[in-house]
Amino acid sequence: MTQSAETVLPPRRVLFVHAHPDDEVISTGVTMASYAARPDTHVTLVTCTLGEVGEVLVPELINLRSDLGDQLGGYRIGELDRSCAELGVTDHRFLGGAGRWRDSGMIDTPANDDPRCLWRADLDEASAALVQVVREVRPQVLVTYDENGAYGHPDHIRAHDVSVRAFADAANPDFAPEAGQPWQISKFYETATPKSFVQAGIEYFRESGGESPFGPAESADDIPLAVPDELITTEIQADEYLPAKVAAMRAHRTQMAVDGFFFALADGIGKRAWAAEHFVLTRGERGPGTEPGAHETDLFAGLPL
């Protein structure tokens, strides 16, 4: 969905930039659902690729794989549509249009060398594509990954890089003037998984005997994506939207097995923990009155809205 020039958007607007279909729900599902449910808030999701190189967990759909029929990207558009419907998100776009940049695959795989992939994208062009969305929607808040892409996936890293560039470029009147009037985003957040959450997961899988997504690690200190709890600036706790997050996860059936670790982890460490999502504010000012060691509870905290 693209907003027309006549569209009057709500006063609070947040832009989420994710790499592939399904990423939107894993780290930001309850956050997106909770804001999408508010009449005063507009949620925009930009997905950078179709996820063409992802795995296929449904046996009867195995021929969709990139090394076989190479039809997975188109199929995942439908999965993403269903996920957004579960989350209540009505404004979703693909960066540069569907299929402009291809899934780059995991690091150090042949897919990284495909000239069509996001990892090889010209940063000016990719930023211009995101700037066009920013200047149209005029979000006060942007949410994406950290500079390591959370767990090092090339597309997550590139989504971060593009977002950082667009954060600056959107406010620059000399950059892509054809993309609309300059707009300054007020707050830039990066998704984060607290060490305490990772440690709880490690201990759960060790005690239950299940296959751990954290491998043989005994401590969250050994997991690169685990962020020290004291660095977390913001926590969105939205228990009532956990069912929407779970339903959105199930919409991505080629990627998430119903007996997979995401659902096992939710059962193991407690659903309330799974309904909390965490962020680090890296650009902009924290909301006033946030005591040392305390978290913001609203991405818009401190903004004059």
Curated annotation (Swiss-Prot):
The gene is mshB. Keywords: Hydrolase, Metal-binding, Zinc. Residues 284-305 are annotated as: Disordered. It is an enzyme of class 3 (hydrolase). Its EC number is 3.5.1.103. It holds the Pfam family PIG-L. Binds 1 zinc ion per subunit. Its cofactor is Zn(2+). Catalyzes the deacetylation of 1D-myo-inositol 2-acetamido-2-deoxy-alpha-D-glucopyranoside (GlcNAc-Ins) in the mycothiol biosynthesis pathway. GO terms for molecular function: N-acetylglucosaminylinositol deacetylase activity; zinc ion binding. HAMAP family: MshB (MF_01696). This is 1D-myo-inositol 2-acetamido-2-deoxy-alpha-D-glucopyranoside deacetylase. InterPro entries: GlcNAc_PI_deacetylase-related, LmbE-like_dom_sf, Mycothiol_biosynthesis_MshB. It catalyses: 1D-myo-inositol 2-acetamido-2-deoxy-alpha-D-glucopyranoside + H2O = 1D-myo-inositol 2-amino-2-deoxy-alpha-D-glucopyranoside + acetate. Zn(2+) binds at H20, D23, H156. One of its GO terms (biological process) is mycothiol biosynthetic process. Belongs to the MshB deacetylase family. Residues 284-298 have a biased composition (Basic and acidic residues).
